[in-house]
Amino acid sequence: MESKLRVGIAGPVGSGKTAIIQRLCENLKDRLEIAVVTNDIYTQEDAKFLTNSKALAPERIKGVETGGCPHTAIREDCSINRIAVEELEHKFTTLDLVFVESGGDNLAASFSPELVDVCIYIIDVAAGDKIPRKGGPGITRSDLLVINKIDLAEMVGASLKIMERDTLLMRKNLPWCFTNTKTGEGIKIIEGFLCNQIPSVHKMV
């Protein structure tokens, strides 16, 4: 098995994908060799955000402009992303982890197995507590489901208990977690999930 792990990060617009990647990079970059590919339709805003936040060195972040449906670029024709990932892997030969962040998409989004090894799907509480029971591949089949922005639950009238109940029903025994990127709550759970997936796990503490 190769030493690097390709991790797809998907979810609707505004769910907090980039913020979670930022947190993970900041927490893990001293222990793991990391790179990121971001997807936007017409800009490279997510790549710029990660660069400006100093989550990683600029040369480890590559922005891809898909120019169309974000789902197509990660599933039906993922060549533009595959090339970007391979360029980073060629440039940094000791990579442990490559994040591929999709453009904001709907609940039907999923990554091609040719592009990533595992998929983390992110939804947020602000979209309402009905989201988990709506289903879709991201909810039911992702390797890890993240329910982000739990700090907004009271503000938007969402019940975390309902979201937990429906998530357990939809995902059976598949892992999931609540997160708050402002406080860092739940981020360690994602790190632990990655720890169990990365061959170079000895670098984790």
UniProtKB/Swiss-Prot annotation:
The biological process GO terms on file are: urea catabolic process
Its main localization is cytoplasm
A single Pfam family it belongs to is: cobW
Protein's recorded name: Urease accessory protein UreG
Name the keywords, alphabetized. Answer: Chaperone, Cytoplasm, GTP-binding, Nickel insertion, Nucleotide-binding
Q: Which InterPro entries match?
A: CobW/HypB/UreG_nucleotide-bd (IPR003495), P-loop_NTPase (IPR027417), UreG (IPR004400)
Sum up the protein's function in the record's words.
Answer: Facilitates the functional incorporation of the urease nickel metallocenter. This process requires GTP hydrolysis, probably effectuated by UreG.
Q: Which gene encodes it?
A: ureG
Subunit (UniProt) = Homodimer. UreD, UreF and UreG form a complex that acts as a GTP-hydrolysis-dependent molecular chaperone, activating the urease apoprotein by helping to assemble the nickel containing metallocenter of UreC. The UreE protein probably delivers the nickel.
Q: Where are the transmembrane segments?
A: none
Instruction: Enumerate the SUPFAM superfamilies for this protein.
Output: P-loop containing nucleoside triphosphate hydrolases (SSF52540)
Give the UniProt subcellular location, in the record's own words: Cytoplasm
MF-aspect GO terms: GTP binding; GTPase activity; nickel cation binding
> What is the organism field in this record?
Prochlorococcus marinus (strain NATL2A)
Q: Which annotated residues bind GTP? A: 11-18
Q: Which family does it belong to?
A: Belongs to the SIMIBI class G3E GTPase family. UreG subfamily.
Q: Which terms in the GO cellular component ontology are assigned?
A: cytoplasm
